[in-house]
Amino acid sequence: MKEKSCGAIVYKKENAELKFLLVHQSNGHYSFPKGHVEEGETELETTLREIKEETNLDVEVDTNFREQISYFVESRNVMKDSVYFVATPITFDLINQEGEITECDWYDHETVKTKIEFADIIEIFEKAYIYIKSIDK
């Protein structure tokens, strides 16, 4: 079986420093907001919907940055593709989704790297960080 999820590395500037949005999932992991693609949805539609559902934020997605990882979820016998974009918030009223998300907050670059547990996600984050720095003149 195969599944696909989409989300984004959401960032903002705070006092000239980049901050990144992480969600703390009820399973104990920190991640960037993302979720399953529903039937008939595009990657962009999924990304916008999931960020809104998980954090209450409306965002502008930059589709010029798109990274994908694939991995096997042994416990469910599923091959999963996760697609990540970068995005900036249009609204700033953070409210975490009850049930799935226990907390959502903004963190600096170094803190994000300590909270994310998976090397492939950190690798995508570093690529996104380089991309964001290149467009943030």
PLM-predicted stretches and their roles:
Residues 1-20:
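Conserved N-terminal beta-strand and adjoining loop/helix that marks the start
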Residues 56-93:
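Active-site segment of metal-dependent pyrophosphate-handling enzymes
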Residues 16-58:
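Conserved Nudix-box catalytic region and its N-terminal flanking loop in Nudix hydrolases
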Residues 29-30, 97-137:
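Nudix hydrolase/Nudix homology domain
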Residues 16-17, 92-95:
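Short helix-loop capping/hinge motifs at secondary-structure junctions, enriched
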Residues 3-5, 27, 79-82:
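Short connector loops at helix/strand junctions that flank enzyme active sites
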